[in-house]
C-alpha cells in the first residue's frame, strides 16, 4: 500500500466550520493526478462520480437546460451520453467513451428501454415523478454496482454511510407524505428491508445494524431544513475524522481530505447569488418535502 508522507504532511488544516478554502477540491484533484498511484486515483474517481449523477439526471430531464447551466459536470460528458444513448437505441457498436459501466447499464435499462414504451403518456403523475424515480434508480446502480463493491474498505464504508442516510431520509419522508417507501429505498439488504416495512421510530434498526441510526433520527426531527443539512455534514465530517484517525499517511487520509473540502465548498457557495440553486439541490436530496418547509426556508433566505 502506497504511503503519501510528503503530500499529507503539506496539507493545510481544515475544520468543519471553515468558510474559506485553502484551495478548491478541483485543484486538489489535479495535483493528485501527479501524486497518487493509478489504483488510488481510481478510488478518488469512484467518490467523484457520486456528484456527477445529478448532472446526468438533469441532462436526461432537459438536455438544453443542462448544457446551458452555470455549473457543469467535471467527469461526465454530455456528448458521450448522447452518443452512447444513440448507439443503444440503434443497437450499434458503442463509440469510444469514458463512462463507468454502471451508467451504461442505467441508460440501457431505465432510459433507452423506457423511451420505447408509450405507457407513460397516459399517466400524468408517473410522468411528473419519473425524474425522481430515475434519480433513485441511478443511485441504486451507483452504490450497488460501482461504489460498494470498490476494493477499498474506506470507500465502501463511506458509500454505505451515504446510502444509509439517503434511505433513512427517504423512509421518513415516505411515512410523512403517505408514499410507499418501497419505491424510494435503494438496496435489498436486511437494513433496507426494515426501512421498507417498519413503522417504528427507528425502523426497528439496532446500532449494531446501523451505528448512526439514533443520530439520523435526531437530524430528521430538526424542522429547519438548512440546519438539518448542516447537522448531516457535521455527522459526515466526524465520521471521516474517526475513520482516518489511525491511517495517517495512507490514501484514505487523502480521500477524506477531498471529501471534507467538498463539504466546506458546498457551504461557501451558499450565498445570495447561489442560495436558491443550492436550496433546490437540498430539497431534491430530501425527496422534495412538504411545501410548508420549502416556503419557510425561502422566507428565511429573504431575511
Where are these regions (language model features)?
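Extended alpha-helical surfaces
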Residues: 1-303
